[in-house]
């Protein structure tokens, strides 16, 4: 497994998230874009809190990014919104809304920043353990990119599953149904032809 670290202290000068086009891209932007552009359907991007484990099995690539989760999410969402190749589905831990600011100082501000960074996209919630297991089980067949952030807050990772940008699940379901119907019709015609010949 490949592991790349980006240590850019001057990144601290770049403020929070937001999609202002006049902002200078962060130092890690080009590498993250290149990695994201290589992904396709059924791949995952995990924008992870700082304690997220480095997985030793193949299929998982970890990059340490000198940024906070909302900043990285904002950048990746901006990039994916320009893509015609893939469509993202966003997932967060079901536990996140229940973490109190008393026990995890800064979590209230984090939730506000994350909501902004997701640009109004629909977000599904699952148990954190289930999300981690699901994404890692897919890693046995498909690539998972982990962007490990500096964020030190519980349940703050964002799991992004990629689907086709030009062929959605509804289109795939309809295609499969049409194929089944056509094959069934052909079988029925063959049966009728055989009965006629006998």
Residue ranges and their predicted role:
Residues 23, 34, 57, 63-140, ...:
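Acidic/Gly/His-enriched mid-domain segments of enzyme catalytic cores or analogous surface patches
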Residues 46-47, 91, 146, 159:
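Structural motif
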Residues 14-16:
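C-terminal motif of bacterial Sec signal peptides marking the signal peptidase cleavage site
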Residues 103-198:
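Glycine-rich, aromatic-bearing surface loops/beta-hairpins
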Residues 18-70:
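Long, hydrophobic N-terminal alpha-helical segment
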Residues 1-9:
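Sec-dependent signal peptide recognition
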